[in-house]
């Protein structure tokens, strides 16, 4: 049986890998690498693949010294863990660079997936891997301006975990690393039914002020929570696609100027237009309430997932080995 290795760098990157794993499972020998200590990625991917932990060289606040040490460790681990002939799939993030390059030295083809939020310029990982990748996979036609040699498959999104329904709550998610500006603005929000995914932030004071709210850090049942929301307020990761396209939720995308290593303002603006979402630029009670009302009036987009199409392309490459 042919072999495929998925690289899941956490958060939305794991979301892409999870979406592909749903289609690849049972059709190939499937391995998935995830960042050490990332229990959420492990729980999601272990349903479909043989999972292996690998060091994540750099997080949002990692300095250059620790980054270089982590990079060296990742190259060493990758050279020991990756064996045989296979297709390796990078879903973005610096996590994917060492195992991808080690695979290239072993003449194993790389599929490099660009992030769905990139419209103006490439991500660092995709830009590095473009010289080595057999296939550069894109979500949108507009991304051909960044990678003319890329292949467009459509947005890489998972099959719905449960049927979409409306339990009446506003879901606010700060993403994998949290969104301090957005989360601070919730303090004055005068709503009874709110669910908050806080990420690494401690929101004990917010819990005390809003005892009716459901506040949690992370959950492997997140998709069930997403499916029951009335409106979703989220960062610019893959939750945008899942909320607007998979579960047809009114979606608000919150721009985070603190994330200097991620997408630019123009990227977030274009993504919000693609999914008929509302872009949230300022974080206070009035702007948030106004965005919620505007989002409820938006019609969800009709866009097909590209996960099945990309999975088929990956298997075709594997058959050629």
Where on the chain are the PLM-derived regions?
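Nucleotide-activated sugar donor-binding and catalytic core shared by glycosyltransferases
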Residues: 1-321
């Amino acid at each position: 049986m042919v072999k495929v290795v998925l690289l899941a760098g956490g958060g939305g990157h794991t979301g892409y890998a999870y979406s592909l794993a749903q289609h690849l499972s049972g059709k190939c020998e499937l391995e998935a690498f995830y960042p050490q200590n990332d229990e959420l990625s492990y729980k999601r991917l272990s349903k479909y693949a043989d999972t292996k932990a690998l060091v994540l060289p750099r997080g949002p606040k990692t300095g250059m010294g620790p980054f270089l040490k982590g990079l060296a460790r990742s190259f060493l681990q990758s050279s020991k863990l990756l064996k045989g002939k296979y297709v390796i799939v990078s879903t973005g993030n610096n996590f994917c660079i060492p195992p991808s390059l080690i695979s290239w030295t072993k003449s194993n083809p790389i599929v490099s997936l660009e992030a769905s939020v990139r419209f103006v310029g490439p991500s660092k990982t995709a830009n590095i891997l473009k010289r080595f990748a057999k296939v550069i996979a894109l979500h949108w036609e507009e991304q051909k301006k960044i990678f003319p040699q890329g292949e467009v498959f459509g947005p890489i999104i998972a099959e719905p975990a449960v049927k979409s329904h409306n339990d009446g709550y506003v879901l606010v998610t700060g993403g994998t690393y949290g969104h301090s500006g957005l989360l601070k603005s919730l303090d004055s929000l005068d709503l009874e039914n709110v669910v908050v995914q806080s990420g690494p932030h401690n929101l004990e004071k917010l819990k005390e002020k809003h005892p009716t709210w459901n506040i949690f850090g992370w959950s492997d049942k997140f998709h069930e929570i997403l499916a029951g929301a009335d409106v979703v307020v989220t960062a610019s990761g893959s939750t945008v696609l899942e909320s607007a396209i998979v579960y047809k939720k009114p979606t608000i995308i919150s721009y985070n100027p603190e994330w200097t290593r991620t997408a630019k303002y123009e990227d977030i603006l274009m993504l919000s237009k693609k999914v008929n979402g509302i872009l949230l630029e300022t974080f206070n009670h009035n702007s948030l309430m106004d965005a919620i009302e505007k989002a409820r009036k938006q019609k969800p987009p009709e866009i097909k997932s590209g996960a099945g199409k990309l999975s088929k392309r990956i298997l075709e490459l594997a058959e050629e080995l």
